[in-house]
From Swiss-Prot:
This is Peptide deformylase. NCBIfam families: pept_deformyl (TIGR00079). Fe cation binds at C123, H167, H171. Its cofactor is Fe(2+).
Length: 198
């Protein structure tokens, strides 16, 4: 559909560095990103996609220390200064590999059940980690185009991948994870909520 293949994004000699990541409180992190229109990505668009893929894949292959960057499992476009609706996710959850490059992702339905990651979440754009449980939906239904599988997805996610997707789409909607922490009782958890993690 788009004028670039995922494999073309991998052929990159880019060397990630900490300056790639826009940090809180940079205003771009509080701007709602724009949908990518049409199917012709510009050279600048492709460059940003390459940066996103390169940064996270370096982390996936345990090379973050080599480049002196903070390790992460996913990244949103505005974290590298690109005000467009895209996110790259690459991590293993037990025996399953989660690998998506989502264009124009939108959450169209959320479960009423609540989940949270234990002990909490972190973010490449937030150096001052905020302690507390980040309140998320247990399941989310997402529509997007996945550049890796080259197809539209219209599916429900649960577990840690659902937490990750909500974190990244939160970025695209001008949010940061700590917006969803109970400021009065950061580690409050209702017994009905699902704890994900140890």
């Amino acid at each position: 559909m788009y004028n670039i293949k995922f494999l073309d994004l991998l052929n990159s000699n880019l060397k990630p560095n900490p300056q790639w990541i826009f940090k809180d409180p940079h205003p771009i992190l509080r701007e709602v990103t724009q949908d990518i229109e049409g199917n012709e990505l510009s050279k600048d668009d492709i460059y940003y996609l390459k940066k996103m893929v390169r940064y996270i894949d370096v982390c996936y292959h345990n090379q973050a220390k080599k480049y002196k960057i903070r390790s992460g499992i996913a990244i949103a476009a505005n974290q590298v200064g690109w005000n467009k609706r895209a996110t790259y996710i690459h991590f293993n959850d037990e025996a399953k590999e989660h690998h998506y490059l989502l264009i124009n992702p939108h959450i169209i339905k959320r479960s009423s059940e609540i989940a949270y990651l234990n002990p909490g979440e972190g973010c490449l754009s937030v150096d001052d980690d905020r302690s507390g449980y980040v309140i998320r939906n247990k399941k989310v239904h997402v529509k997007a185009y996945d550049l890796i599988s080259e197809q539209f997805i219209d599916q429900e996610f649960s577990g840690i991948i659902a937490i990750c997707i909500q974190h990244e789409i939160g970025h695209l909607d001008a949010g940061l994870y700590y917006d969803n922490i109970n400021q009065q009782q950061p580690f409050y958890a209702d017994p009905s909520w699902t704890k994900i993690g140890r």
